[in-house]
Amino acid sequence: MDSTLLEIVACPICHGRLALDQTSQKLVCHFDKVAYDINQGIPVLLAEQAMPLSARQEEP
């Protein structure tokens, strides 16, 4: 994912900063404890498609 895009995207739920999980290739909101898919380089930032993080994924 483009680093410039990563700097401007925000969580659609809390509007907070998202982090890129290099392992799963998902954008993670540690505040809401959810992850968002990245489809062909485009983040899918729909609150209804957010996936809850497992306990292991919650660590920054």
UniProtKB/Swiss-Prot annotation:
One of its GO terms (cellular component) is cytosol. Coiled coil: none annotated. Gene3D superfamilies: 2.20.25.10. This is UPF0434 protein PM0859. Belongs to the UPF0434 family. It comes from Pasteurella multocida (strain Pm70). It holds the Pfam family Trm112p.
